[in-house]
C-alpha cells in the first residue's frame, strides 16, 4: 500500500508541476486509496473487525513516521533545506492520517454491523454474553482510534508544513517569473506580495525589494503598502530633466533620513517597485521616474542584470482591492512622539508633524456667506466647480503637499509665552527665495473646449541657479513661458495702523438680489456709477466663458488698456486691478486659463475657486474689449465685486475702502484658491532648544529654512510672484538674548519718517525707517525668557527675502487716521540690495549641507523697475483713487481714473506726492 501511495503522490506532483501537493489533492488521494484497497468488491462483506485492524496497521506506520517528521519540521524552522524524501514522508503521513480519519468517521459508521452494536449497547441485551463482550471490545477499539485521531498533535504540524511549503513554492514561482521579466514591466498584486514575503524570509545577502510610493507625503502617511523598505517620492518633487543625483539631492531633500539612505542604496536592491494612485498626473510622473532611474542613473547606474524595476499594475487602489489590501500601514506619528527640532538639532528630517491648518489670512473667510452659496449653485460654468470638487475629493492627494521640510522643524508646539511678546512675534514662516514652481493641481480643466496648451509650471525648482532663467526677461518682451519657475505665498502685509483690525468673521444675512441687465460683453446698462447699498449675484447671473475666452493664439497683448466703471466708491478696487494687471506673468495665466487647472477646491481658506474664476472672467472681458471693441467701452466689474463681497463682507457695500487692503485681500484670495498645499496642516512652533539653535544661525540660513517650512502649507503662483519675507528680532539689552520670528508678506507696508526741513523724503529713507533698530517703550518691553522678566529691549526688522514683484505700501495714515501728505520720492529703478539680509557666516545646522537649502532667487543685486502706482487723493473716508501703469515701450505710461484712461505725456508724472501703493518688478543686468 505504501509504495502505491508514494507512486500516486509522485505522479500527481509531476502532473501539477509542483514539489508539494495541496491538502485537497492529498485528501483526494486518500479517498481514492480507500476505495481501491479497503472497500473493493462488495462493501457489505467488509466487517467491522477487518476495518479496525486495517486502521491500527496504518496508525502504527503513521506514528513511526511522526518521529522523523518532528526532526524534519525542526530543521525547516532553522532554515535548513528539506530533501525530496523528507517531503514525501510528510505528504505520505498526511495521506495515512486521512485514510484512518475517513474510515473511522465515515465508512465504519455506515456499516450495518456498527449500527447493531450501538443498538445492542444501548439496550444491554444480556442473552448474548459472548457476543456482547466481543462487541464491547470492538467498540472500545473504535473509540480509542477516534480519540487518538482527535488528540493527535502531529497532524496540525503536518498541515502547517504543507500549507507553508505550498505558499513558498508559489512565492518562488512568482519570483522566478519576476526574474524573467524585463525592467519596466507591470507586476500584479500577487507577484508583489510574493516578492515582499520572499524578501521577509530571505537569507540572501542582497537586499531584495525597495518600494517607491509616488504620491503626496500626506497620502503616504495616511496609508501605504506595509513593508520595511519603502520611500515616498512626491510627484511634484521631480521632473523629466532630473538625474538620479537630482532625485537624491533635490527631490528627497526634505525626506526622512531613513528614506534617503534607502534611496542611496537603490542599486543594491534586487527589485525596485514603483506604484502610485489613479491620478493622471501621478501616473505620468511614475513614467518619468522610471525613465530617470533607467536612463539617467549616472551616479549609481542600475543594471537590469542585477536590479529590475517594475510598476505595480493598478497601483495602490488595486492593492487595496486585492486580498492583500489589509497589508497597509500609516506613518502618522503620535502626538507624544513628535520631534520638530530635527533640522536644528541633528539634521534629521523624519519627525514630521501634521496638524490642522490654522487661519493664516484674516481677509479670507473660513465660511462663505449666503451670496457665495448662490454663486456656487449658479447655473452656468460655476457648476464646473462642483464637478471639480467631486473629482478633487477623489484625487485630494494632488492638492496636498507635505514637503519634508516640515520635517526639518517637526517640533512646532503651542506658542511658548516666554518666547512671545504679542501676536506680532508669533512665528509664521519665511525663506530665501528664488522661484519654485507651484505644484500642479491636476483637476479637470473647467474651461471645456479650450485646447490651448498650459504653460503653468509643474514642479518646484530647487537648484541654486534657477534665477538665471529670468535674467533675460524684460518687461516689454516677456516670454510666455518665463514663469515656469514659481514659488509661493500666503500672508498678511504689515498694514497701516488704521486698518490693522480685520472685521470679525461673522455670517451675514443673505443680501437682496439685484438683477442687472448685462449685455454679452459684460457692460452694465446702468449708469457709470452704481450705488446700491449691497449687491448680490442673482440666480440668473451666469459665468459663461465662451464670450470672453480668447480664440487660438497665446501671443496676447499683455499691455491692453480698458477703463473700469465705478460701482459706487469702488475706485479703490479699480486702481488696484489696473496695477495688478501690469504684472505680465499674472495676467498671462488668467488669459490662457492655465490657472484653472490649479484651483484647489479643498483649500481650507479658499473660496472654492469663486474669486479666481470671477477675476479670470474680468480679465477676459477687459482683454476682449481691448481687442474687439471699437469704442473702447469701459467694463463693469460688478460680478467680480460681488464675488469679493461674498468672500469678505468688507467689500460688499458701496462704502469707500483702503486700496492697499483690497490689494492684500485680492492676492491672498487668489493665493488660497490656487494654493496647492491649502489642505495641508501646519507645523507646530519650535521647541525652546530648537529655537535656541536657530538663533545661532545667520538670518540668511534660518530664513531659508523657515521659508521652506512655509512652502509646505502655502504654495501657489501668487506666492512665487509676490511673496517676500522679513525677520523680526527682539533683543534683551541686559543679557543680549534674542528671539527672531520670520514673517511672510505680500504687501510690504513701510513707514514715512518725519520730514527734515532741509531734505526731501526718499523711499530709501522709508526702508531705513522700516529696518532701523527700535527701542521698545516701557509698556512694550519684552519678557526675556533668559532673564525671566520684562527688560529694556529692542526690536529690529530685516528683509530676508525679496520677491519677483514687490508691492510697497506707503503708510500715510497714523493711528488717528490722519494722513501724511509728504512727498516721498521713489525712483523708476530702485536698488534694495542694501536692505537685504546678507549675513551668511558659513554655519549650517548639524547634518545640513550647503547644497541642501535652495537659494530660490535670493542672489543680489536686487534691483526693481517701477510699473504701477496707485494714488490716493483726499482723506481715508472721502478720497479718490487713480493709477499710473506702465504698458510697455509702445504705449508707455497710462493714467487710469475709473472709466477713463490716457497716455502720460511725461512719465515723470508717475512720480507724484499722491503715491500710496507702488508696484515694482525685479530686473536683471541693469
From Swiss-Prot:
Q: Which UniProt key words apply to this protein? A: Cytoplasm, Endosome, Hydrolase, Membrane, Phosphoprotein, Protease, Thiol protease, Ubl conjugation pathway
Q: Report the subcellular localization.
A: Cytoplasm; Late endosome membrane
USP domain segment(s): 562-923
Reaction(s) catalyzed by this protein? Thiol-dependent hydrolysis of ester, thioester, amide, peptide and isopeptide bonds formed by the C-terminal Gly of ubiquitin (a 76-residue protein attached to proteins as an intracellular targeting signal)
Name assigned to this protein: Ubiquitin carboxyl-terminal hydrolase 4
Question: Is Ligase found in the keyword set?
Answer: no
Written domain comment of the UniProt record: Residues 1-208 are essential for the localization to the late endosome and constitute a late endosome localization (LEL) domain.
Q: Name one GO biological process term.
A: proteolysis
InterPro entries, A to Z: Papain-like_cys_pep_sf, Peptidase_C19_UCH, Rhodanese-like_dom, Rhodanese-like_dom_sf, Ub_carboxyl-term_hydrolase, USP_CS, USP_dom
Catalytic positions?
A: 571 (nucleophile), 880 (proton acceptor)
Kindly report, in one word, the top-level EC class recorded for this enzyme: hydrolase
Q: Which residues form the Rhodanese domain?
A: 205-328
Which SUPFAM superfamilies does the record associate with it?
Answer: Cysteine proteinases, Rhodanese/Cell cycle control phosphatase
* Primary location: cytoplasm
* EC number(s) per entry: 3.4.19.12
Query: GO cellular-component terms in the record?
Result: late endosome membrane
PANTHER family in the cross-refs: UBIQUITIN CARBOXYL-TERMINAL HYDROLASE, UBIQUITIN CARBOXYL-TERMINAL HYDROLASE 4-RELATED
> Where Phosphoserine occurs, residue numbers?
443
Q: Its topology with respect to the membrane?
A: Peripheral membrane protein
Tell me which family the UniProt entry assigns to this protein: Belongs to the peptidase C19 family.
Q: Entry's Gene3D superfamilies?
A: Cysteine proteinases, Rhodanese-like domain
